Amino acid sequence: MKMKKLGSSDIEVSHFCLGSMTWGTQNSAEEGHAQIDRALEAGINFIDTAEMYPVNPISAETIGRTEEIIGQWVARHKRRDEVVLASKHSGEGMQHARDGAPISSATIPGAIEGSLKRLQTDYIDLYQFHWPNRGSYMFRKNWHYDPSNQNRAETMAHMEDALGALQREVERGTIRAFGLSNESAWGLTQWAAVAERVGGPRPISVQNEYSLMCRLADTDVSETCVNEQIDMLAFSPLAAGLLTGKYQGGKIPAGSRLALNEDLGGRVTPRAFEAVAAYLDVAEKHGLDPVQMALAWCATRPFMGSVIFGATSLEQLDVALGGAELSLSDEVMADLDAAHKAHPMPY
């Protein structure tokens, strides 16, 4: 398993990261623990979670359960120093957390304490803001995104306020580093600039959706990541399961994400299935597993810190892990580029 230091930090992470958002709904605690064990055996040291997990569905009854499942594993195995744990502070509008309050110096200490308690640890390696207070163009909002109602002065004041609170947590030893999620190129540069101007932890990562099917980061965000030493953590690298091919031809496997979410968060479109067919053709042409090909491709990107993938079975996990050592030839990369040009932005 390849390792690298994340962003400008000294935190070393595997280039594949184990996602956890189904632990507590689609997966039991025991299944989540088995996934952690298998991933660590394969060389993964990086686990991503969030206070709002699990999903499918998100509910007041289950919020925080995924962190609790990870915490049970931490307490049982006493291997905390072998794992880099990342979690997230929910953003404005998440009614199940602090009645939907925006992220601020008033919410950060309590949110961190809650995560620490559930994770049964005294520190979080990477603490991320799940989405910006000012809004985001992620999750298909890019099609009608309008930032004209944003207030720059309020945004700057918020960043200064939040960074002050985060710095106090760093000094307390409760978090090691700070990351962002569902953030834009402008937002990344402003967080970095404010941190340098007023003090506070500079962001080392941004967790955004990124896959063969969703490449919004290829231009401005990628340039920002490279120049600001902010590594991308790609979520949904399999396009919520579309790139596995299991949904082609109208199939909806029992217990699958599509069976629980009929449009996969806006990803189910006729053009999406056409794009998947093109990528499946590339995999078949070169004798590759499509899951491993998609994950390995993400890992080749020059701004990538780690590729976050999830699984609902050990069989799925083992297939995904096979992509960690896969090297894609120039011919494969050229065919993937051609498929992308033929099927850009399918959702």
Over which residues does each language-model region extend?
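N-terminal binding-site loop/beta-alpha segment at the start of enzyme catalytic domains
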Residues: M1-K88, A106-P109, D122, E171
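A structural motif corresponding to the C-terminal end of an alpha-helix
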Residues: A42, H77-R79, R118-Y123, A162-R176, ...
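Glycine-rich, positively charged active-site loop/lid region within alpha/beta enzyme cores that binds
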Residues: S14, G135-N151, T224-V282
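Conserved short secondary-structure transition element at the edge of the structured enzyme core
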Residues: M52, V170, P237, R257-E325
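Basic phosphate/pyrophosphate-binding loop/patch that engages nucleotide-derived ligands
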Residues: V170-E171, L216-D231
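Glycine/proline-rich, positively charged
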Residues: Q95-Q207
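Active-site beta-loop-alpha junctions enriched in small/polar residues
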Residues: M21-W23, M52, K88-E92, F129-P132, ...
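Conserved, mostly hydrophobic/aromatic
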Residues: L6, L18, G32, I47, ...
